[in-house]
């Protein structure tokens, strides 16, 4: 996938968040699902709705990370009982390790601790993280999508 397409998709994920249409996990998942030709119906975004703000406001795993792992599952996850899950697990770990290296933590409350919750600075931090993770997930997909 070319850098122009990645940048456009990042901008779309950030816009969904900035316009308050979706939060981190939902924005990222929606953009990747659409990019892949919607292997699952758009309504499946509901599955990502509990992940924002670190698992339902708990401040734990960042929603951009969990949404990214869900999005990778669209391409690498298994769809039948008993199928091999090794690639999906490896891709999830790869994204997790990259995220930790990139941001210093996978914990939402650590990533936003410098900002007042709900402030414009907090929003921009989360939008930036969502965009950056969207880019990484797109780079982890096969070249043909």
Which residues are covered by each model-predicted region?
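Polybasic, low-complexity association/targeting segments
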Residues: 1-19
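Acidic-glycine-rich active-site phosphate/pyrophosphate-binding loop
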Residues: 1-5, 32-50, 104-111
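Phosphate-handling active-site elements
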Residues: 35-46, 72-91
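Structural signal for hydrophobic packing residues in well-ordered secondary-structure cores
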Residues: 17, 21, 32-36, 55, ...
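Helix-adjacent hinge/juxtasegments
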Residues: 50-83
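Active-site nucleophilic cysteine motif
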Residues: 21-25, 62
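C-terminal binding/interaction regions
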Residues: 87-145
């Amino acid at each position: 996938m070319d850098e122009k397409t990645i940048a456009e998709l990042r901008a779309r994920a950030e816009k969904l968040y900035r316009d308050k249409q979706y939060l981190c996990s939902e924005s990222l998942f929606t953009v990747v699902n659409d990019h892949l030709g919607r292997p699952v119906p758009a309504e499946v975004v509901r599955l990502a709705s509990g992940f924002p703000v670190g698992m339902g406001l708990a401040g734990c795993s960042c929603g951009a990370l969990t949404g990214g792992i869900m999005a990778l599952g669209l391409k690498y996850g298994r769809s039948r009982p008993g199928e091999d899950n090794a690639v999906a697990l490896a891709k999830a770990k790869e994204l997790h390790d990259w995220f930790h290296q990139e941001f210093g933590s996978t914990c939402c409350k650590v990533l936003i601790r410098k900002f007042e919750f709900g402030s414009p600075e907090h929003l921009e931090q989360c939008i930036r993280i969502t965009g950056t993770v969207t880019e990484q997930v797109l780079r982890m997909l096969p070249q043909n999508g």
